[in-house]
From Swiss-Prot:
A (Z)-N-(sulfonatooxy)alkanimidothioate binds at residues 386, 419, 441, 470, 519, 581. Keywords: Iron, Kelch repeat, Lectin, Lyase, Metal-binding, Repeat. This is Thiohydroximate-O-sulfate sulfur/sulfate-lyase (nitrile-forming) NSP4. GO terms for molecular function: carbohydrate binding; lyase activity; metal ion binding. It comes from the Eukaryota. It comes from Arabidopsis thaliana. Kelch repeats lie at residues 326-374, 379-425, 429-478, 480-524, 528-583. Pfam families: Jacalin, Kelch_KLHDC2_KLHL20_DRC7. Belongs to the jacalin lectin family.
């Protein structure tokens, strides 16, 4: 709620009030006559739309000054200085913004007054007017209602009814108050910090007898993650927020995060420095402002790669791998649970052209989905995947110099047959982790040595690394890392396996952590593991539906165990849209190493056929 500063002058004429719901004042028109100020007229901006208020006073044979124009959002109105006479008429006015001051309009006689509040801006006016302007008062709002260039406004999630509110942007969030209603969240209120000043925000919604929960953030900590659920409840025509949990950079959580009814949403991507949304008697929606780090440890950029020729087309649940200047694609589906083909597609990076690779030898007998593929040298290695009747493929190699397939291990002789597992490789070993067999999810890790041509069953990881599918699997500095996945619900734990010691270790990560997810794109880039998108909540129809998919590019530093978000909002970068079940690999394009991904499942349950590359500039 804006701060109302008392009107100065008299109370003759009629009372008027432009209101306080605007974002800023953008233009002021004033006319002065023999008795002082004859009229004022203000133009405001609200949600990007210009709104002209009525003329306050009467147009006569007066001198109309040049309009005082305020260049929102870089400029804002700070104060008004004026004078009024004993009869209660405003004689003169001067307006000041943070960048300039208007000329005096009217006379310098009379009693002086000033409308100003430190660290706030004027967002509305009110007063009395008849044939002249009798009095003038103002509404003030925090300066932080203007989004700074280094902050990003995240769209509010939830319903589209209720009053719009916006607390603006601050240095930090100090406290969070959440009030409960019978079916969800009744109200929220936030306390912020601006420099040494504590700013108490308004209550959004309405308190009930069910109480209020308070979450305090330490002075050296900040919120990086909000998880919520939205749902239409009790016959409502629009969604409301039914659950909220706040998590800080140091891992402090306001509420235990667990699966709940409704549609899950997350607000994340950096330090959260403000909130906005809609409310009625309940909290209808919630969005946030995030402060983006100006100097990420890993620098890169997304580009969409042009594609020509006969390629894989629209599909998901396939895999890709790079050999030299070519990217290979195998497996996948267009219709849920229906494999498309068993072609091996090859993309020439130089010509940007897809084609179907010639193939001889032990060509895989099954068209499959949920397959994995990696490369070592000039050879591709393909394991698992299933057809529509849940028959599984074995373990194959493909020599890209001779275009020959070889069946290295039949289904019945190798690791447990599976789909939606994860694969990675180093110079001599292919690693296969997790996935879904005919009867259960798995948490085993097997390695195949390409020199000895033998499988090795790695040590059992223990209870902390639950059986899962759709995890990220990358080899970084000799360790095999398992990142996130799905074990019946989305998880966010991270583990690594040391092949030398045959030992598993779970690690605690921190920073701007991505939310729980699976079936995301991933790549190993130096000491970092970079991921994009994925599924954050399973669809009620399981693999038949799209699930709840997300976007976002994150990097985990495997030495410091710190996560950071890499996306550059706006500018020339063409960031991929939300997706999961995409094919991805570590690749080099145009001399840059990065994450390349193809296709995937869209939130609409459609399929993508695009090719994106996140190329690293420096690390």
């Amino acid at each position: 709620m804006a701060q109302k500063v008392e009107a100065q002058g008299g109370n003759g004429g009629n009372q008027w009030d432009d209101g306080s719901e605007y974002d800023a004042v953008t233009k002021i028109q004033v006319a002065a006559g023999g008795n002082g100020i004859e009229y004022v007229k203000f133009t405001y901006v609200k949600n990007g739309q210009t709104e002209e208020a009525p003329l306050r006073g009467v147009k006569g044979r007066s001198f109309e000054a040049d309009p005082f124009v305020i260049n929102h959002p870089e400029e804002h109105l700070v104060s008004v200085e004026g004078r009024y006479n004993p009869e209660g008429l405003i004689l003169g006015l001067t307006f000041k913004s943070n960048k300039k001051t208007s000329d005096l309009i009217g006379y310098e006689d009379g009693t002086p007054f000033t409308l100003q509040v430190q660290d706030k801006k004027i967002v509305g006016f009110y007063g009395f007017a008849g044939n002249n302007l009798h009095s003038l008062g103002a509404y003030f709002a925090p300066l932080t209602n203007v989004t700074p260039l280094n902050a990003k406004k995240l769209e509010a999630k939830g319903g589209d009814t209720g009053d719009i509110w916006d607390d603006g942007v601050y240095d930090n969030v100090r406290k969070v108050y959440v009030g409960q209603a019978q079916y969800g969240i009744a109200f929220v209120k936030f306390e912020y910090v601006n420099g040494s000043q504590v700013v108490v925000g308004d209550e959004h919604g309405k308190k009930t007898e069910l109480g209020v929960e308070e979450f305090e953030i330490d002075a050296d900590d900040y919120i990086v993650y909000v998880e919520g659920y939205r749902e239409k409840v009790n016959g409502m025509t629009s969604e409301m927020i039914t659950f909220l949990s706040f998590k800080t950079y140091k891992g402090k959580t306001s509420q235990p995060i667990e699966q709940r009814p409704g549609i899950k949403f997350v607000l994340q991507g950096g330090k959260i420095v403000g909130f906005h949304g809609r409310s009625t008697d309940v909290l209808d929606s919630l969005g946030a402002y995030i402060s983006l780090s100006p100097t990420p440890n890993l620098h890169g950029k997304w580009t969409k790669v042009d594609e020509n020729g006969d390629g894989p087309g629209l599909r998901c649940s396939h895999d890709i791998a790079q050999v030299g200047n070519k990217i290979y694609s195998f497996g996948g589906e267009f219709t849920p649970n229906q494999p498309i083909d068993k072609h091996l597609y090859v993309f020439d990076i130089e010509s940007r052209t897809w084609s179907i690779s010639p193939a001889t030898g032990d060509i895989p007998t099954l068209s499959c989905l949920g397959v994995c593929m990696v490369s070592i040298g000039s050879t591709l290695y393909v394991f698992g995947g299933r057809d529509a009747s849940r028959q599984y493929n074995g373990f194959y190699s493909f020599d890209t110099t001779t275009n020959e397939w070889k069946l290295l291990t039949p289904v019945e002789e190798g690791p447990t047959p599976r789909s939606f597992h994860s694969m990675a490789a180093d110079e001599e070993n292919v690693y296969v982790f997790g996935g879904v067999s005919a009867t259960a999810r798995l948490n085993t890790l097997d390695s195949y040595n390409i020199v000895d041509k033998k499988w090795f069953h790695c040590s059992t990881p223990g209870d902390s690394l639950t059986a899962r599918g759709g995890a990220g699997l990358e080899v970084v500095q000799g360790k095999v890392w398992v990142v996130y996945g799905f074990n019946g619900c989305e998880v966010d734990d991270v583990h690594y396996y040391d092949p030398v010691q045959d030992k598993w270790t779970q690690v605690e990560t921190f920073g701007v952590r991505p939310s729980e997810r699976s079936v995301f794109a991933s790549a190993a880039l130096g000491k970092h593991i970079v991921i994009f998108g994925g599924e954050i909540a399973m669809d009620p129809l399981a693999h038949v539906g799209p699930g709840q998919l997300t976007d976002g590019t994150f990097a985990l530093d495997t030495e410091t165990l710190q996560w950071e978000r890499l996306d550059k909002f706006g500018g020339e970068e063409e960031t991929p849209s939300s997706r999961g079940w995409t094919a991805s690999t570590t690749a080099t394009i145009g001399g840059k190493k990065g994450l390349v991904m193809h296709g995937g499942k869209a939130p609409t349950n459609d399929r993508f056929d695009d090719l994106f590359f996140y190329g690293i500039d420096s690390a």
